[in-house]
Amino acid sequence: MSLKIGRNDPCWCGSGKKYKKCHEAFDEKMEIMKQKGYAVIDHDLIKTPEQIAKIKESCKINIAVLDYVEEHIKPGVSTEEIDRWVHEETVRHGGIPAPLNYEGFPKSVCTSVNEVVCHGIPDEEQILKEGDIINVDVSTIYNGYYSDSSRMFCIGKAVSYTHLTLPTIA
């Protein structure tokens, strides 16, 4: 059975407006695009104000965890130690580290040091040293809502990288 929203029903987006005054014209255009073979996003990708508020709660944990990392990161720290910090702080704030065991990923955070572009796996043997740059990518599940953010850190004194030849992407 197909459920169709009525023109005078509340809009599916949660705005409180009638469907005909909110998303009806948009949905009609999307249906035409779908019939022409274009990929069209589902309504569940568009979040209600209540869902956005819950996502923001998850984001607050990410920010707190990254702030903790910023306070403690220094030369001599292993990326495995960063993983422990992230795991413990995320759980302490009531969250779940989203990367842990996702499609076999073995850690609670991604740590990408220097030339590693993204999704580096923390390791006890990877010790941060003066001049390294590291991206710490934190993803949190809180009350069923996901958030993802990262921060780049310069370890020790900032170093000029102008002497390096960086790859060019065409």
Protein language model features and the residues they cover:
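Acidic/histidine-enriched ion/cofactor-binding microenvironments in catalytic or ligand-binding pockets
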Residues: K47, S112-Y145
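Short, basic/aromatic beta-hairpin or loop at an interaction surface
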Residues: Y102-E115
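Acidic/negatively charged segments and metal-coordination signatures
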Residues: M1-L45
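Conserved small/polar residues in nucleotide/adenosyl-binding loops
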Residues: T162-T168
